[in-house]
């Protein structure tokens, strides 16, 4: 400000380059493909809308899976009574109302989180759990490429899987070991990709 030089807000400047702290996944999913196809900037509001819809669908699927796993019957009225405030309290309505550059990584991280939890829960009651675990962990790992702080939701894996893998010693069986690898592998792959990206830039 003192010298009158132009600068960008809320970014880091290091050795002649600007850096943002948000993950790169929104760029890879929306901005870059749209730019390559049209030569124009991607409308951020559309991306936020897509992420919001994905979140609502995901939270609905997650609640349905949770209800089926823990309760025999849940009325539609009770389901909606729980779903509506859950969506309202998630912050998604605020993100939809203000679809800015800041909103998209957060909305996308929330969407990947609920779908990741859904896949994990589905895997717990499936004979072919490895595929569900793989999909769930991929979603949860991709959260880091959107909004890194949301990786804390991955800690829910401990209460979800501790009994099966540790208490019941499923981890020490060939099938359990394969499933456990499917839970961990996506994190390793996504982490390697993010580290390579950071090194390249």
Show which residues each predicted segment covers.
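Juxtamembrane membrane-water interface segments immediately following transmembrane helices
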Residues: 1-12, 18-22, 177-201
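Juxtamembrane segments of multi-pass membrane glycosylation machinery
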Residues: 8-50, 68-73, 95-99
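Transmembrane-helix motifs of polytopic, lipid-linked glycan transferases
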Residues: 42-72, 112-119
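Transmembrane-helix signature of polytopic, membrane-embedded enzymes
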Residues: 59-91, 111, 126-135
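Structural signal for the C-terminal ends of transmembrane alpha-helices
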Residues: 63-68, 120-125, 159-169
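Specific aromatic-rich, kink-prone transmembrane helix
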Residues: 107-126, 135-140, 154-157
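Perimembrane helix-loop-helix junctions
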Residues: 152-187
């Amino acid at each position: 400000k003192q010298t009158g030089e132009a600068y960008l807000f809320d970014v880091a400047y290091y050795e002649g380059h600007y850096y943002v702290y948000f993950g790169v996944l929104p760029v890879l999913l929306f901005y870059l493909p749209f730019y390559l196809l049209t030569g124009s900037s991607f409308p951020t509001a559309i991306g936020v809308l897509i992420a919001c819809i994905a979140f609502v669908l995901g939270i609905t699927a997650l609640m349905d899976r949770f209800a089926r796993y823990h309760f025999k019957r849940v009325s539609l009225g009770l389901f909606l009574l729980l779903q509506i405030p859950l969506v309202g309290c998630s912050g998604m309505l605020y993100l939809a109302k203000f679809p800015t550059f800041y909103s998209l990584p957060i909305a996308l991280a929330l969407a990947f989180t609920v779908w990741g939890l859904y896949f994990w829960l589905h895997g717990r009651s499936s004979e072919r759990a490895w595929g569900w675990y793989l999909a769930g962990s991929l979603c949860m790992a991709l959260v880091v490429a959107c909004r890194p702080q949301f990786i804390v939701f991955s800690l829910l894996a401990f209460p979800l899987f501790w009994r099966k893998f540790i208490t019941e010693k499923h981890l020490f069986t060939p099938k359990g070991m394969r499933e456990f690898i499917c839970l961990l592998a996506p994190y390793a792959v996504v982490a390697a990709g993010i580290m390579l990206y950071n090194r390249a830039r």
